[in-house]
A protein has these predicted regions:
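Juxtamembrane extracytoplasmic/periplasmic/luminal helical "stalk" adjacent to the first N-terminal
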Residues: 8-86
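Extracellular/periplasmic ligand-binding regions of membrane signal-transduction receptors
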Residues: 62-99, 118-133
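Extracytoplasmic/periplasmic sensor domains and loops in membrane signaling proteins
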Residues: 90-102, 132-173, 236-264
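Solvent-exposed, extracytoplasmic
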Residues: 98-111, 199-241
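Extracytoplasmic/periplasmic ligand-binding sensor regions of membrane-associated signaling proteins
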Residues: 109-113, 122-203
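A short beta-strand signature within small-molecule sensing/ligand-binding domains used
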Residues: 176-190, 268-277, 284-286
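Helix-start (N-cap) segments at beta->loop->alpha junctions
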Residues: 189-191, 202-213, 240-241, 281-284, ...
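Cytoplasm-proximal transmembrane signaling helix
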Residues: 226, 285-331
């Protein structure tokens, strides 16, 4: 009799185990399909968001290019570009900076909403610093020259330089996004003089670049990085990366050596979905990096909760049925 009872119990338990396995398999399959669909839809969302961020950055850059084009043919600047100053004429030079800013730049931007030229470095080596009139020493001009703003190989092409400390202003705020900037330069050629007469300098605070695509960061649930064509950092939603001034070397190589613009990247920190879009205007790379757990984390957590509840319910049913079965057996 005891052996018979044990056999019946084993059958009941085996039956519930089979039911548990079957239900778990069905639930796992449904959740896997949901996870794959969610990942596919999320990739599309990220792609649209990255393309939107890249388009906004292109609009921002195109405005800078247009401003440079406008002042490249402005005859009002010609008289200043020919000037040379002695060390004793520093205040005269600063007065000229104020006159240029007030009479030329401010009048073309009444609403004060457009990006402005941060400085002009003439062919004679004179620096007109519109970002900070008091920060116009020779060391600033030397650093601009070291960047390559007057490099003959650049011709008239606009060049951008990696994120770095903003040396064209004298005061630091302590906020890396405000203290770091992306420099851009363009050599200006005069058709009347048949020579390069100056270089336009644009100094864009990282904070201003970040504001251009900030809304897209929220949509992606990850981080966005803006790199130049060589993989150097220009801007990012990652505060630590901005403070460091560069991205991880392994990540940089992975981006530059990519075979497709949308891929999964596995690192020591986990798996990430990566989306890259390259600008035809500036050759900048807009890169979104999203941890996979941010995409399917909620679905996986829901699956785990349902699975735990399912097991508890089945175990409860086993206990109840065994108790009921024992009640019907003769003592």
């Amino acid at each position: 009799m005891g052996q018979r009872r044990w056999n019946i119990k084993k059958r009941i338990m085996a039956g519930f185990v089979l039911v548990l396995v079957a239900v778990s398999a069905v639930v796992a399959l449904l959740f896997r399909q949901t996870e794959n669909k969610l990942r596919t839809e999320y990739r599309r969302l990220v792609q649209r968001s990255v393309e939107s961020a890249a388009h906004r950055l292109d609009t921002f850059i195109r405005e800078i290019y247009n401003i440079s084009d406008n002042y490249a043919f402005n005859n009002q600047l010609d008289s200043y570009l020919e000037k040379e100053y002695t060390e004793e004429q520093v205040y005269q030079r600063r007065a000229d900076v104020m006159r240029m800013y007030r009479n030329i730049f401010e009048t073309s931007d009444i609403l004060q909403k457009r990006e402005k030229i941060s400085g002009i470095l003439t062919a004679k080596g004179v620096l007109f610093n519109f970002a900070d009139v008091n920060c116009d020493g020779q060391e600033v001009a030397d650093r601009l020259t070291a960047l390559g703003v007057n490099d003959p190989d650049h011709l008239m092409r606009f060049y951008w330089y990696p994120l770095q400390d903003n040396f064209m202003v004298s005061d630091a705020s302590g906020d890396p996004r405000r203290d770091k900037a992306v420099f851009g330069s363009r050599r200006v050629y005069s058709v009347w003089k048949s020579a390069y007469v100056c270089a336009h300098i644009f100094c864009v605070q990282e904070e201003d670049l970040y504001e251009v695509y900030r809304e897209n960061v929220v949509e992606t649930k990850g981080e966005i990085y803006v790199l130049d064509e060589h993989g150097n950092l220009l801007s990012s939603s990652n505060d630590e990366c901005i403070a460091r001034g560069r991205i991880d070397d392994i990540f940089r190589e992975r981006i530059l050596n990519r075979t497709e613009d949308d891929f999964t990247w596995k690192s020591g920190y986990g798996k990430f979905e990566v989306c890259v879009r390259e600008s035809e205007l500036s050759r900048w790379l807009t890169v979104a990096v999203i941890p996979q757990k941010n995409i399917t984390g909620e679905v996986n957590a829901l699956y785990l909760r349902i699975y735990v509840v399912l097991i508890l319910c089945l175990l409860g049913c086993v206990v109840v049925l065994l108790r009921m079965y024992q009640g019907f057996l003769p003592r």
